[in-house]
């Protein structure tokens, strides 16, 4: 019986405690409502005073009262008050205050799409193109709006073009140490055309991981970016076609083999052609067919592909994807050789990380996405796959660059145009000048 009374007593005490807490919570709500109501009244008093000042066109004083109302009181009316303050700034021509408020709203994530557009246009007028691009980039991430997108696309592809005096050059790798020929020998230049390694080589590859292969007095030699020798060929190779990572492709008597970058044979297997790739896989040709091999030269696929599309880096793969051909046409594959989509195209260019340049049976070029869907119709004489959101296209005999909406972003008056690599591309102008085109806002495309 005593135990039963104890249990009942505990239950009663628990109920009392709960009732006390409920009453306290109710009182807290009442107090908060009273305080909030007081805040709303005080806030409204400031706004009424501001309206009186506006009748006399004393906008800056009205602005200050609105700011005080926003800063000192946090009520449900604050979002509306802030938008009304924008109207006051615009009506009173308080330009600096207007854009400061928009900037604050953008940072807080409360700005509307038109505010992003207005602020970006203001930044462009002030000559701050980079900040305008950043503003539009933030807006693009939040809104699907044609006006914002059109403005963003119109400014994000700002570029500089620098002439280099050498016309016989090779496409560099991502480091942009450019192999160039002075008419007699090969050397290396940077993007401004300055010589970084003298013209002393009979042949020269691009650099990969700070190494390149050059030919000196008939012997292939591994050099660093400082020009120092690190290895020499003892295989009497006839040609070195590529270097990538720790491997090179050497040719002897018309047969291709893979060597270490110190010219040690990695296999005694001969191929008809070989492409190395940054992702480590090897694409090799034997008996007229292509296969994908691992970095250990083990077959990932059989020799089943009729052709492979090579990109401007001289590689078949970009990341984990490539374009290959079978008897029905070109299509996309992943690094394990499995198809990415079912669509087959009459022709295709190597993948560069964006839209893929593909052709129809008539030889007209357009663009496919990664699902095999045509997103830019077949209409061009030639094209290169997209990189950095731009695709080089040939139209009416001249090259230019289009964006994903098929708008010409870099005028089509070029004799030739390469893919963008690390934000830069090599072009030839209609006057025959070789130039390096550099995107001003490369970080936007990363």
Please tell me what each predicted stretch does.
Residues 16-34:
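Hydrophobic membrane-insertion alpha-helices, especially the h-region
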Residues 6-9, 20, 98:
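Helix-centric, low-specificity signal for extended rod-like, repetitive segments
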Residues 40-67, 78-446:
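Residue-level detector of conserved, function-critical positions
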Residues 1-14:
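N-terminal Lys/Arg-rich, disordered targeting/topogenic segments
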Residues 31-43:
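Hydrophobic single-pass membrane-insertion segments
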């Amino acid at each position: 019986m005593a135990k039963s009374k104890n249990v009942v007593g505990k239950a009663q005490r628990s109920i009392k405690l709960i009732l006390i807490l409920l009453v306290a919570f109710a009182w807290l709500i009442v107090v908060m409502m009273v305080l909030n109501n007081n805040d709303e009244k005080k806030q409204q008093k400031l706004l009424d005073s501001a309206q009186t000042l506006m009748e006399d066109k004393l906008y800056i004083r009205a602005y200050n009262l609105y700011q005080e109302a926003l800063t000192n009181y946090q009520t449900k009316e604050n979002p509306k008050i802030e938008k009304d303050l924008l109207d006051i700034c615009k009506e009173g021509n308080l330009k600096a205050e207007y854009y400061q408020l928009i900037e604050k709203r953008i940072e807080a994530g409360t700005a509307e799409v038109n505010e992003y557009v207005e602020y970006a246009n203001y930044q462009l007028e002030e000559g701050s193109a980079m900040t305008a691009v950043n503003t539009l980039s933030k807006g693009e991430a939040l809104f699907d709006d044609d006006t914002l997108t059109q403005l963003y696309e119109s400014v994000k592809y700002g570029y500089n073009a620098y002439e280099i005096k050498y016309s016989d050059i090779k496409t560099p790798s991502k480091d942009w140490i450019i192999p160039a020929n002075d008419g007699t020998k090969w050397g290396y230049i940077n993007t401004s055309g300055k010589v970084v390694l003298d013209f002393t080589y009979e042949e020269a590859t691009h650099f990969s991981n700070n190494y390149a292969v050059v030919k000196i007095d008939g012997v292939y030699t591994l050099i660093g970016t400082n020009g120092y020798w690190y290895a020499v060929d003892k295989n009497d190779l006839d040609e070195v076609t590529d270097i990538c990572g720790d491997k090179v492709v050497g040719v002897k008597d018309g047969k291709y083999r893979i060597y270490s970058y110190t010219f040690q044979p990695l296999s005694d297997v001969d191929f008809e052609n070989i492409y190395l790739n940054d992702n480590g896989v090897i694409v090799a040709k034997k008996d007229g067919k292509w296969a994908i091999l691992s970095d250990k030269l083990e077959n990932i696929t059989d020799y089943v592909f009729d052709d492979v599309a090579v990109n401007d880096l001289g590689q078949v793969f970009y990341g984990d994807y490539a374009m290959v051909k079978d008897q029905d046409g070109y299509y996309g594959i992943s690094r394990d050789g499995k198809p990415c989509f079912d669509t087959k195209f009459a022709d295709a260019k190597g993948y560069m990380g964006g839209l893929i340049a593909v052709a129809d049976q008539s030889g007209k070029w357009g663009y496919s996405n990664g699902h095999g869907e045509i997103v830019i119709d077949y209409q061009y004489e030639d094209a290169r796959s997209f990189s950095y959101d731009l695709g080089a296209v040939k139209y009416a005999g001249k090259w230019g660059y289009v964006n994903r909406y098929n708008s010409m972003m870099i005028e089509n008056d070029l004799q030739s145009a390469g893919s963008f690599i690390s934000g830069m591309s090599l072009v030839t102008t209609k006057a025959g000048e070789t130039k390096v085109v550099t995107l001003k806002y490369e970080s936007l495309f990363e």
